């Protein structure tokens, strides 16, 4: 969320549009609500003054209902859902969904809105995130990359699946396959998998945004672990760097990863119930990507250039925020 705000603000400011971050910083021409907001009264007053209120929506919190994440996390997740639902139904004058999947999910659960809605994919700076530049991609091993901000609160299941994927890939091939995890992982969880996985696994911890392009270029494949992700930035960034993506067909992955930009395979069960996934099919698809890098890497970059550029995203948001200004 912070990454999106920073990129959008920079894009707007480069077009001569001032950006403020508090409802008290009047005057302003429109309000973009990114995530939850505590000052619902202030938001309502802005709408009453005739100021457009645009809500940007991804998905909803749901993993906490299936996995034990603690009472505090459960209540926080439900509270977050309630705030988003209230803004969507009572306050917003326009809605921007991050993907068709996100729109369909919200409309299935809570019905369509009476206000206009758009779908705008997340974008990335195609000059900063590109296939050319420093990298340390190994020549005699295959590197599978997992990028998540934080693997906790139920999202630990993504690491478990990534380990299972690499185990099966290693069983199919004699060439070494290593798993690199970029993101916050509890030390106890790191130790558990280092002792139990029986594969080469390296935990990088949280990686600074400016280092992500080199990290992406240094891998052969990104495994997108987030189930039912609305529009994961890690996928957008990987594609821009020419890194093919492998994932199960959940969330918006099939919208983002098209043609030879990667491989999206059926989950093999009910992902909404966290059924065990079909790792054999994903491993087979992943190995196809690994042995045909010359086919998949250019296609990944081409997909990003066609649809996922930052300028394209900024212009789309600008048309919603300030119609006619573009």
Where are these regions (language model features)?
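Acidic anion/phosphate-binding donor-loop and adjacent secondary structure
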Residues: 107-108, 123-140, 214
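Glycosyltransferase donor-sugar binding loop
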Residues: 149-150, 163, 175-190, 205
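Aromatic "clamp/platform" in nucleotide-sugar-dependent glycosyltransferases that forms part
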Residues: 227
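Nucleotide-activated donor-binding/catalytic signature segment of Leloir-type glycosyltransferases, i.e.
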Residues: 190-213
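A short, active-site helix/loop in glycosyltransferases that binds the activated sugar's phosphate group
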Residues: 85-116, 124
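A charged, aromatic-enriched C-terminal amphipathic alpha-helix characteristic of glycosyltransferases
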Residues: 134, 277, 281, 290-321
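Conserved donor-binding/catalytic core segment of Leloir-type glycosyltransferases
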Residues: 135-167, 180
């Amino acid at each position: 969320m912070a990454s999106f705000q920073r990129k959008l603000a920079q894009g707007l400011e480069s077009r001569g549009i001032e950006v403020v971050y508090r409802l008290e910083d009047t005057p302003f021409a429109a309000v973009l609500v990114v995530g939850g907001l505590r000052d619902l009264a202030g938001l309502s007053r802005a709408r009453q003054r005739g100021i457009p209120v645009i809500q940007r929506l991804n998905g909803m919190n749901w993993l906490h209902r299936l996995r034990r994440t603690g009472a505090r996390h459960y209540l926080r997740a439900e509270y977050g859902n309630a705030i988003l639902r209230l803004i969507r139904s009572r306050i917003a004058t326009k809605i921007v969904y991050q993907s068709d999947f996100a729109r369909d999910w919200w409309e299935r659960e809570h019905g369509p809105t009476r206000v206009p809605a758009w779908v705008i994919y997340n974008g990335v700076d195609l000059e900063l995130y590109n296939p050319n530049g420093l990298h340390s991609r190994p020549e005699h091993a295959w590197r599978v990359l997992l990028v998540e901000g934080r693997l906790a609160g139920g999202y630990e299941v993504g690491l478990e699946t990534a380990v299972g994927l690499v185990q099966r890939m290693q069983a199919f091939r004699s060439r070494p396959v290593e798993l690199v995890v970029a993101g916050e992982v509890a030390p106890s969880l790191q130790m558990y998998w280092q002792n139990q996985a029986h594969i080469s696994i390296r935990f990088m911890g949280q990686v600074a945004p400016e280092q992500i392009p080199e990290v992406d270029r240094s891998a052969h494949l990104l495994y997108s672990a987030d189930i039912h992700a609305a529009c994961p930035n890690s996928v957008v960034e990987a594609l821009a760097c020419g890194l093919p993506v492998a994932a199960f067909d959940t969330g918006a992955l099939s919208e983002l990863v098209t043609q030879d930009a990667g491989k999206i395979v059926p989950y093999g069960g009910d992902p909404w119930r966290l059924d065990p996934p079909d790792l054999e099919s994903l491993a087979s698809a992943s190995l196809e990507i690994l042995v045909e890098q010359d086919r998949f890497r250019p296609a990944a970059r081409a997909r990003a250039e066609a649809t996922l550029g930052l300028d394209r995203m900024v212009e789309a948001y600008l048309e919603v925020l300030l119609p006619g200004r573009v």
